[in-house]
A protein has these predicted regions:
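Metal- and O2-centered redox machinery and metal/ROS homeostasis
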Residues: 15-27, 37, 51, 89-91, ...
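Domain-level detector of nuclease and nuclease-like folds
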Residues: 39, 98-100, 107, 120
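Stable alpha-helical elements in mature extracytoplasmic
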Residues: 10-14, 38, 42, 113, ...
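C-terminal functional modules
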Residues: 119, 123-176
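A bilobed periplasmic-binding-protein/Venus flytrap-type ligand-binding module shared by bacterial periplasmic
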Residues: 100-113, 136-137
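Ligand-binding pocket segment of bilobal, Venus flytrap-like solute-binding proteins
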Residues: 4-84
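Soluble non-cytosolic domains of exported or imported proteins
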Residues: 5-9, 32-36, 111-115, 125, ...
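Short, well-ordered beta-strand elements
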Residues: 1-2, 121
Length: 176
């Protein structure tokens, strides 16, 4: 079981879930060392057609590149999670992971001075799977951020055109 890289916030959670789920009877916990080492471990397992069990997060290029399957877990339990995040938790109990919420915030004056921009930002949403796929394309192609953005605009029109008025979408399409 490839654990979270040492020093990362996920480290006590993965270590405590390892204990709470009684995985020591079946799996050896392997510390990843770093994010890059963890990424390389996944790539190596995939290239060898070997199974991989471990921690990873999304959205990322790795999730977009490989056919990863999220392990089923019980629902998030706030009380159990408090102990999971504590490296010194004496009796960890199982909980699903807390959902990371992404919020778009603007200062009040922006809403007043640039209501069109504020409206655009309020509509902006991209599913994690799509972000991961775009990041994977960028990594596979050694793309610059501008190239990745252009790739997104060309290939994910159904998403971004919901954020802008039709005339703006037409201008963006014409510029591509």
């Amino acid at each position: 079981l490839y654990g979270c890289p040492p020093g990362w916030g996920c480290e006590p959670i993965t270590n405590n879930l390892y204990k709470a789920l009684g995985l020591a009877e079946t799996f050896e916990m392997f510390p990843s060392g770093s994010g890059e080492t963890l990424k390389a471990s996944i790539a190596k397992a995939v290239s060898r057609k070997e199974p991989f069990l471990g921690y990873y997060w999304g959205p990322t290029d790795v999730i977009g590149k490989y056919n990863m399957v999220l392990m089923a877990t019980p629902p998030f339990d706030a009380e159990n999670y408090k102990c999971l995040v504590d490296a010194n938790c004496a009796d960890p109990k199982v909980s699903g992971w807390a959902k990371g919420e992404v919020a778009v915030a603007v200062v009040t004056t922006m809403k007043e001075r640039a209501p069109d921009v504020a409206e655009f930002l309020s509509k902006m949403q991209v599913p994690n799977a799509d972000i991961s796929a775009v990041l994977a394309w960028g990594d596979d192609n050694g793309a610059t951020t501008d190239e990745v953005a252009t790739y997104f605009l060309k290939n994910y029109e159904a998403i971004w055109t919901q954020w802008v008025p039709a005339e703006v979408a037409d201008k963006v399409r014409a510029s591509l």
